[in-house]
Amino acid sequence: MAKLTPFAWIAAVAAGILSLAGHQVSAAAVDGSELPFPPVPSASKAGPTLQTSVHHRRAQPNHLAKDAPNVLIILIDDVGYGQASTYGGEINTPNLTRIAQSGISYNAFHNTSICSPTRAALLTGRNHQRVGSGTIAERAVDWDGYTGVIPKTSATVAEVLKNYGYKTAAFGKWHNTPADQTTAMGPFDKWPNGYGFEYFYGFLAGETSQWEPRLAENTSIIEPPNTPGYHLTEDLADHAIGWLKKHQSYTPDKPFFIYFATGGAHGPHHVAPAWTAKYKGKFDDGYEAMRERIIKRQKESGWVPQATELTRRVESMPAWDSIPASERPFQLRLMETFAGFVEHTDAQVGRVIDELERTGKRDNTIIMYIFGDNGASAEGQRGSISELLAQNNIPNTVDQQITALNKLGGLD
């Protein structure tokens, strides 16, 4: 079996957890260089007969103190931190705010511009190309650094914590397996269960429908629930809460590690109309005026330096004043739908945190709420009613936009 070699941040997390727990361990144990731990030798001795044999049930080693903290990593997809009300934005994120107000906020999270590399680096603590993730999993090729497969010699944080006795689970987006290896036949060692997660519920792709997702549970492809009003992000929160309840019932003495990675707010932007309606009229003066408001608030709050200047509008984004009046309702509805989707996503995160509070576990849980894996959603530009149309550079006609106006965000 290959030795697991976690890199700096994972080793630091493990060391910090052990330190917080008041547990004294050797340097080798802290850095994880000898994981998995060697098996405990048996104290039993078999003699010629039962009477001359000695049986002692071996005690399982405890590598953690009783009060070792739980760990919850929350990763939101395709958002920029400047969009959150927490940091001066226009989208309500009360649950991000309550975590920020009770902890420490960082505004220099260094990531890559696409999903898979950022996630591979986050999970392993290594440069994304060092772990085969130089591009998104769907574009994996057999070149060093671009295979789309995290090598087994590079431990994920889940593997490290699992070896120390943590219960581990992942919910939501898993974008670190090449597309041709996500079928019902595996190979399953490239799925989350093969990277230290004892339980997985989510999807194996960069995106999926929130209404009719392609779901996987552990190593099985499953059908989504046929429930009226079903929404994937709500389902992920339901499963995370259910898992926490099982943990509380069966293994309350063991700490847990949860990786909660939502599909929101990556396209397609799917959310119930009630959430979209909350932003009706909020952006009527256009996105350029919105940017000015956000940067002003961020400077006032100290989130960005006073000398910060807005980036220039990219040429592919038309100036708001240049958009014909007949097209503006469509553009505004796109913005309102996205905003509703983001707030809805934050609300589901809040439900998971509520469960930690209900069971009295929040105070002993390290929560890392990462608001954006690679910056804001790039599905903007002129907007589209169909991703396939956008990918083929086929613009929507005004008639198509008007017809689709009240369908945006919905199943149709």
Where are these regions (language model features)?
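Bacterial N-terminal signal peptides that target proteins for export
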Residues: 1-11
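Formylglycine-dependent sulfatase
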Residues: 2, 17-18, 22-412
